[in-house]
Swiss-Prot record:
Main subcellular location of this protein, as a coarse class: periplasm
Keyword Disulfide bond attributed: yes
The protein's name: Solute-binding protein Bpro_3107
Keywords associated with the record: Disulfide bond, Periplasm, Signal, Sugar transport, Transport
Gene Ontology CC: one annotated term: outer membrane-bounded periplasmic space
InterPro entries listed in its UniProt record: DctP_fam, TRAP_DctP, TRAP_DctP_sf
Transmembrane segments: none
Amino acid sequence: MTNRTPRISAIRSAALAALLAGLGMGAAQATEFRSADTHNADDYPTVAAVKYMGELLEKKSGGKHKIKVFNKQALGSEKETIDQVKIGALDFTRVNVGPMNAICPLTQVPTMPFLFSSIAHMRKSLDGPVGDEILKSCESAGFIGLAFYDSGARSIYAKKPIRTVADAKGLKIRVQQSDLWVALVSAMGANATPMPYGEVYTGLKTGLIDAAENNIPSFDTAKHVEAVKVYSKTEHSMAPEILVMSKIIYDKLPKAEQDMIRAAAKESVAFERQKWDEQEAKSLANVKAAGAEIVEVDKKSFQAVMGPVYDKFMTTPDMKRLVKAVQDTK
């Protein structure tokens, strides 16, 4: 199990520092914003992208604003950093949309299984009005949705091949802490097991879980490939990452500085995508070199059981409209 005491201390220290800084924030005061990320690698695409955003923001603000990225779960799990951002104890966090599902319901739309036909389709959909509407919808929950980052296609990795949906039956598969993700994996006949990202490696090693589902770069950089060697390309979701800012912090800034932050975030998207494509190719080579087997699957068998997931979660007119808009995007 992960030793949580140092992390909790770090979270409390970060929260105190943020609150003290917020008390004295003035229009002319230089600010070093803090942003969280759970990935270990300092050059992981999302980590690098927020660092790049910080460089852009520093230039746009004439050195007034900077961003320091705390990755490796230094400020907590994705759920913990979301909680900090909501109360203004942390400025930014980069998380997968999964942990935002309950807080900002429209983020469930891009999480839905087999919604996107390709990475290009996902990018085009989220670059347009659909993505803008989903980001905007987070404001009522206390978050400024700034950008979507690529997270590739998520697939199942285990000690054995998962070639059809029947092969997943009964497996304990780690999922994100989201009701939608529990339902998605349960629809396969598996036992969905919510677990923080930082605990997956130990869970796989000890047999607490049989499998996990994620993209190739995470399979590689989180060293999950050391624990299990079979990556079955279910590609059941292309759920993106989302970069959010605390609305409490954002609302204290002048309009011109708010616009700088939004512009820097948007400009970082193309950078992240380039890094993502490079990392995905590199990670695929890495896991193959580590002895991983990449397995093609019968995707139709997985798609066939996902109807109830849509029925359960795509319940509002807005959700249904956005799903159709994605499906109609060419």
